[in-house]
């Protein structure tokens, strides 16, 4: 009886707008809401199980991104294309992984979902789970055979993305399952740099315990500490120095770390670096010392600090 009523309402809706059935994504709405009776009514009356909206999002995708397990099971049993991709390359598995719906994820994988399919940015469901901090889904995907060192089109690893979000439980899952700490993206940045650049203090602490390369160089010969100083992330700076980061490093242009702190007018950072033994008279590619740059800023406290530490022109 419920099926008959749902079917009647469905066709009333169609004819009231005088448009073709295939133009009405009613199946998608029902799938999203978990309205299994309406979904069955539409499919059993001849509706396509692979109906799409204008962005090629299918009913299975609608069900997957709303954790509608019963609807997803039914659609799959009726021949829904598990690996269908929408306009941006997302699959039902990607939607479920992004939202940490592990029951849907497991159902899709058991139904033949391809773990290696990538979206338009080069990411698999695995990467999308990592960016969302969904460590339960990550763990499941790894157990199903995904490579923990999967990269996207920019050679960014899942560990790097997890560092950006700063989700420590996710980092634990990745590292415990073989994610490599010192891999580099196309710019030469490691996972540690990703943590540093987003000022992820807890994630940085966690990563440092696992002994990544502390002075890894990117394509411009910047180290994690140089990035932290440039961005004036004092807590991160202290963490890196505690783990023996080189405070006297220069980038590929010959600019020393302390110069970035001086230009930022970060008096506390400069004071800290001095206390840790930085070369206060180091010069850059132009032969200019930190004192010269301090004078340029006209920051009296900075000038006095550097002079009191023995800074010269």
Which residues does each predicted region cover?
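Conserved ankyrin/ankyrin-like repeat signature
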Residues: 38, 70-71, 103-104, 136-137, ...
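Ankyrin repeat A-helix N-terminal signature
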Residues: 29-34, 62-68, 95-101, 128-134, ...
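Ankyrin repeat boundary signal
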Residues: 49-52, 82-85, 115-118, 148-151, ...
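Ankyrin repeat domain, specifically the short helix-to-loop turn at the C-terminus of the second helix
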Residues: 43-48, 73-81, 106-114, 139-147, ...
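Ankyrin-repeat-protein effector appendages
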Residues: 17-27, 144, 177, 210, ...
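N-terminal segments that cap or nucleate solenoid repeat domains
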Residues: 21-62
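Bacterial N-terminal signal peptides
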Residues: 6-15
